[in-house]
Amino acid sequence: MDTYQPPIFELSQPGKHGTNLPALDVPEVEFPAALLRQDDLNDFVELTEPEVMRHYTRISQRNYCIDTGFYPLGSCTMKFNGKLHEEVARYVGFATAHPLQGDALSQGALRIMAELQRDLAEISGFDEVSLQPAAGAQGEFTGILAFRAYHLDRSDHDRVEVLVPDAAHGTNPATAAMAGLKVVEVKSDRRGNVDMDDLRGKLSHRTAGMMLTNPNTLGLFEDEIVEICDIVHGAGGLMYGDGANFNAILGIAKPGKLGFDFMHYNLHKTFTTPHGGGGPGSGAVGCTAALAPFLPGPRVRERSGEAFADPTQSQQPTSAADASPLQYELFTPEKSIGRMKAFHGNFGMLVRAWTYIRTLGEVGLREVSETAVLNANYIRVKLADLYPQAIDRICMHESVLKGQIVGAPKDIRTIDIAKRLIDYGFHPPTVYFPLIVPEALMIEPTETESKPTLDSFIAAMRDIAREAVETPELLREAPTSAPVRRLDEVRAARQPILRYNAEAFAKLRAGE
């Protein structure tokens, strides 16, 4: 059976249509030329409704997602998203709320936001939280802008450098550069942690702060984190916590108590709001009281001791005693860096995170991290004899192995292992990250996977290691069972075709 599904543009046939319109029984109206499309409609698709439906249904059946299988992407926390959270987010009062309907008609939504702010602050050990940033990278940008505003507010104009570990997520240096600051790289030591001597040597009166992920991108806990924070603070800098790996320490360690001044939470990772496919996400941020005046607004706070007019009621309260005990309003901090996003963040994601926290409670959140760490170490230990470890020590929520299989030909690489996993029915782990590890395989199983699932993945990885030694051509040719064989990823990156073009597609098929 031919598994190829051509682009919908190539299925089009002139004269086909999905809807029959009634005969025109009103006068024709001529639209002004300025309102009419000027380019041609050569690529306008003409198909029947069943053909359109079948095309997209076939494509959807090829999707791989967390609802269909194990998704061990390192540094992505692809945990299963509970469906209760989806149900709550779809409540009509939340799903149909409009950000311009005003505080009085948004009390339920504002209460959700206020309680989530409080919960995230408690879980992380920070004083204040803003829910506005739309994703982790935007949360980072928020934090570094707040750092810059904090230093400028103190007339400390020399602090223009941000320290970033060599194992950091790529968004860290990009964030600092976008904020107009200089990036200074800090080396890792042989244990995979920050090299303390290198850190001390790069601190100066120009240091605005340091960005650090803990656990780091090697999946290892920075066990000298308190000293790192003390050293940076001693030099007048601030500590930014990249919360990408927060799933490893819920209920175990609080970044705000360890010495961090600011951190973003990836609600779409740690707090099980769906992610992948472009969003939406949520990069809520927490900070110390000293940085709270610079948070983006508006934020939510509880009103107390005053009457609140409700336009839906004919009888209005005349005193605070008559008012509802739970009343919330939006406000902007006095020295706010301004909005990071229109309105109030991705509200549906906030509802899901709020539900997740209440579903699990304090004990459940700690169990999340304990199980995530256990699962990651189980995989690490079961594969370490065939796939060398990047750093030979206990990991946290994810492990980093090398695709340099013991006994395999030298030309068998991580990309071959990843492609072969597709033939075994698994989504590949993250590959070639962190950049400081040659042939890196970053595996994050999360807490929602069962031992039988982990054992199946381990068995597949061990089978692939055997194939790499005995029949390496299987890896070189993989995937063989997917609808599309191995892609030319270099060409795709260098010559992207981002919209359909018949001529370009014809050249691709001809191998040009």
Where are these regions (language model features)?
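Conserved phosphate/anionic-ligand binding catalytic regions in large, soluble enzymes, centered on
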Residues: 64-85, 132-143, 271-286, 343-349, ...
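A short, small-residue-rich loop immediately preceding and capping a beta-strand
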Residues: 127-133, 161-164
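Non-catalytic terminal extensions of PLP-dependent enzymes
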Residues: 1-127, 145, 253, 303, ...
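Conserved PLP-enzyme active-site core in the AAT-like
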Residues: 108-111, 138-302, 308, 325-327, ...
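Short, flexible loop/turn elements at secondary-structure junctions
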Residues: 77, 135, 168, 216, ...
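General small-molecule cofactor/ligand-binding pocket signal
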Residues: 130, 184-186, 429
